């Protein structure tokens, strides 16, 4: 009978020693599993934060670009207005007074045609016929005195020749009005001042 007791006592220590080994294995396995877990909430919040900052920066860039485009036409308009005002002021100082319309510009080397009549009516008829017959410019009408009136035209030589002939023919049809008709193909430059109209009133 003493042998079974010894066997039971020898078996019990073996069982008690196996338990601590299992608990140690469990302790070793659990920390390994815990270290493998990942904090997903932190990464998700960081991603959402980066997306929100990206959206905000994109929106800020768009608003700044729109403001720049809106300000550009205004600045251009201001520059153009300033440039126009500056050019106007600069050109305003350089503007020359226009020449008198009553005094035509005499060009040297252009033919001169003259018709002198007795009375005003033949002179008007001659001037009308000359300007209608050819491309000439009526430059002067002078009261000579004693009822004589002189009309002068300028233009190319052929045009002045045709105009004076037409004026003389028209003047002869109005009574005995024609006194003289003459053409100078190229008046001298010293004669030019004498051709300017004097705007003298009718003389008795």
From Swiss-Prot:
Main localisation: other
Biased composition (Low complexity): 1-14, 41-84, 92-102
Compartments, record wording: Carboxysome
SUPFAM superfamilies assigned: CcmK-like
Alphabetical keyword list: Bacterial microcompartment, Carbon dioxide fixation, Carboxysome, Photosynthesis
GO molecular function, one term: structural constituent of carboxysome shell
Any Gene Ontology CC annotation: carboxysome
Pfam family for this entry, one: BMC
Annotated BMC domain residues: 111-196
Residue segments, region Disordered: 1-102
InterPro entries: Bact_microcomp_CS, BMC_dom, BMC_shell, CcmK-like_sf, CcmK/CsoS1_BMC
Gene Ontology biological process terms, A to Z: carbon fixation; photosynthesis
Assembly: Homohexamer.
Annotated function: A probable carboxysomal shell protein found only in Prochlorococcus and Synechococcus strains that grow in low light.
Recorded family membership: Belongs to the bacterial microcompartments protein family.
PANTHER family given in the database record: BACTERIAL MICROCOMPARTMENT SHELL PROTEIN PDUJ (PTHR33941:SF11), PROPANEDIOL UTILIZATION PROTEIN PDUA (PTHR33941)
This protein's name: Probable carboxysome shell protein CsoS1E
């Amino acid at each position: 009978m003493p042998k079974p007791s010894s066997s039971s006592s020898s078996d019990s220590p073996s069982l008690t020693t196996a338990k601590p080994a299992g608990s140690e294995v469990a302790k070793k396995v659990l920390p390994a599993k815990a270290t493998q877990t990942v904090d997903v909430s932190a990464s998700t919040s960081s991603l959402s934060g980066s997306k929100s900052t990206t959206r905000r920066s994109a929106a800020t860039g768009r608003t700044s670009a729109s403001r720049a485009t809106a300000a550009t036409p205004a600045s251009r308009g201001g520059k153009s207005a300033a440039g126009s005002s500056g050019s106007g002021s600069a050109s305003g100082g350089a503007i020359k007074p226009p020449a008198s319309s009553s005094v035509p510009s005499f060009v040297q080397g252009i033919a001169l045609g003259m018709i002198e009549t007795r009375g005003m009516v033949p002179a008007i008829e001659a001037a009308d016929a000359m300007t209608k017959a050819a491309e000439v410019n009526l430059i002067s009408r002078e009261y000579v005195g004693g009822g004589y009136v002189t009309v002068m035209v300028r233009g190319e030589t052929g045009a002045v020749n045709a105009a004076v002939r037409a004026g003389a023919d028209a003047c002869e049809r109005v009574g005995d009005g024609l006194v003289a008709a003459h053409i100078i193909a190229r008046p001298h430059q010293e004669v030019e001042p004498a051709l300017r109209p004097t705007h003298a009133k009718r003389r008795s």
